[in-house]
């Protein structure tokens, strides 16, 4: 293996990732409509017609589920909440394993812990810093229940390789 850049080796990336605007006019308009309504959140913590949020949230979930052809979609406030929901939705049991990246926000590793499962770190690949499919496959055991995949810096993971591995091992 060559010397890491931090130890004097050649860096993989010499040009910084580009900065870009992530909020467009449509998003600004939608946010202003919610703010102008005078009610930022219609989520209620009791069973009620608005239990799952206001009109905008319910419209988003409906549109999302129709677009992807799925029965349900749940909007959450952050990727952290989404990861926690996704791990819980697997029906994971205590002591089962979840393969996670060592190079991501801590929620990827803590979400399995919430369900008394075990996070198992797989290595990242050197160009995009996402999970290395070969190491993911090496880490799979009879206790593996899920793989948490995250994109880093807007760079996607190797979708085809990871999905093939996930299907292979169910």
Name what the model sees in each region.
Residues 1-80, 85-88, 149:
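Conserved PLP-binding active-site segment in aminotransferase class I/II-type PLP enzymes
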Residues 88-170:
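PLP-dependent aminotransferase-like
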